[in-house]
A protein has these predicted regions:
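Short, acidic Gly/Pro/Ser/Thr-rich loop/turn segments
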Residues: 1, 100-101, 129, 215, ...
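Class I S-adenosyl-L-methionine
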Residues: 2-199
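C-terminal target-recognition/interaction regions appended to catalytic cores
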Residues: 147-316
Length: 316
């Protein structure tokens, strides 16, 4: 509801963004807080949450959480800072009970990826459009895949099935891949031969075909739009000339291969695209746990020394 992309497209929406019922979903989250009264909580949202409706939405959220007994802080985090091979900027909101001054927004340990997207995907079997594989075969795992527990020793592979593509799409994919691999250039739809152009609204379709940045440490953001088509997520290997599979998208999000997404392929792509990357979530959880441990230690020290818990000033 607060997406910057969605805001740019709001003139084409049936329901104006300011009337989107999702704007009040935080009230449902607050119901759980009132019921369980945790010391701390965390939730993730898109970058536009603080600027939506001229900032009014964020002020309403702050005010409401304050009324139910919580202080909240919101900071931009990028999944690539957590070892995930993807640029994914999100607002991570952390809240803690009012009066618990020992608590506050955690400091997260940042890990810059030291591998490439190609190395992340290299042990997944090659596919051509419409094909699938249910085992790895003789493929070599990268150190990143091993160290982060993405793949086990079992030779069972799920969700590695790619969409079928038309001959026209395959020709376009090959051009897009060649441009990227030769000089990191993006395909401009208007530069295609007329025989390959089928969309009337060519202005909005200019950057519709995009190759995953295989030779980089981070690729562009995996989106739920993958459920509609794969043109924006073309596999970087020109021999395969296809869009990425659910398993490949899940790997880019840092999901282990043992994680299975239910439902038809469209629903699986939506789940992957909307998810918080597990490696990022793990570090956020560690940071929250560390804050709670620090508070417990300070309170324990108070019992023996009579000291007062220092007030931690945090922006709200």
């Amino acid at each position: 509801a607060y997406s910057l992309v969605g805001r740019a497209q709001s003139s084409h929406m049936e329901i104006p963004m300011e009337q989107d019922p999702r704007n009040s979903l935080y009230l449902l989250y607050a119901d759980f807080l009132k019921r369980y009264n945790p010391k701390m909580f965390v939730f993730e949202n898109v970058m536009g949450i603080k600027s939506a409706n001229g900032g009014a939405t964020w002020r309403n959220i702050q005010s409401y959480f304050k009324r139910i007994g919580y202080v909240i802080d919101c900071k931009e985090q990028n999944s690539s800072d957590f070892g995930v091979l993807q640029t994914r900027k999100r607002m991570i909101i952390v809240g803690w009970r009012k009066g618990s001054e020992c608590l506050g927004y955690p400091i997260f340990d940042k890990v810059i990826p030291d591998t490439t997207v190609n190395e992340l995907l290299q042990d997944l079997p090659m596919l051509t459009p419409g094909k699938s594989k249910s085992n790895y075969g003789r493929t070599r795992r990268s150190a990143y895949v091993i160290d982060n527990g993405i793949r086990t020793d079992k030779d069972v592979l799920t969700l590695h099935q790619c969409r079928p593509n038309t001959r026209r799409d395959i020709k376009i994919y090959k051009r897009a891949i060649q441009l990227w691999n030769d000089g990191h250039q993006r395909l401009n739809y208007n530069d295609l031969p007329e025989a390959l152009k089928t969309h009337k609204n060519r202005k909005s379709f200019t950057d519709r075909f995009k190759v995953v940045e295989g030779d980089q440490q981070c690729c562009h953001t995996i989106l739920a739009h993958l459920s509609k088509d794969g043109h924006y997520f073309i596999h970087p290997d020109i021999r395969q000339h296809r869009s990425i599979t659910v398993r490949e998208a899940a790997r880019i999000q840092s999901f282990p291969d043992s994680y299975f997404f239910e439902g038809p392929r469209t629903a699986q792509f939506v789940q992957v695209g909307n998810a918080v990357p597990p490696m990022m979530a793990k570090e956020i959880a560690r940071g929250i746990a560390q804050k709670l441990k620090e508070e417990a230690q300070i309170k324990n020290d108070q019992l023996t020394s009579g000291a007062i818990c220092p007030v931690q000033k945090n922006g709200t």
